[in-house]
Amino acid sequence: MRNQAITVSAMSLVAIVALAPASAAADQASGTIKLQSKAGPIIVNVANVYMVKGPDAASGKTIRQLIFASADLSAKLQACASMSCASGIVSDGMTVDFDAGPRLNYWVVGNGQKVQYSGTARPDETLKLTADTADRLAGSLAIDDGAMGGATANVKFDAAIAKQFSK
């Protein structure tokens, strides 16, 4: 009887662990993102990157998105139930959408989202990937829209999927 109780308890523990949501842990990234504001330049020293997957807001098509930040956003990302929430947790950093079309869509924010810039970039000119799978993106990204009053970004990253959304 005691062995049965231990077996059932062990099976229950395995089931609980299997059903628990995976942690949306940060992967390491490095580099800088710069954005011009009226008060002067905003510089974000990137330390963390997260890869999320889910439906694009415009098309509904499943896309991959990289979220670059200096702060650890793991807890906030874990609490998100949608892709729009995941994008919205960035207060100083950048999101980059993959698979939404022939260009990369990106959004850069600084000073607690008070300063924003969005644009598109040609992957063949700005992106060098060393890994490109459904569950992992690695490489470097160099965007320079500074001459147009926009953002510049020069980051290296290696990101495994942190979270997948259905909405």
List PLM regions with ranges.
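A short, sequence-level motif marking secondary-structure junctions
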Residues: 47-53
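Short, hydrophobic/aromatic-rich segments at coil-to-beta transitions
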Residues: 28-30, 61-65, 134-140
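Surface-exposed helix/loop patches within compact recognition domains
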Residues: 54-131
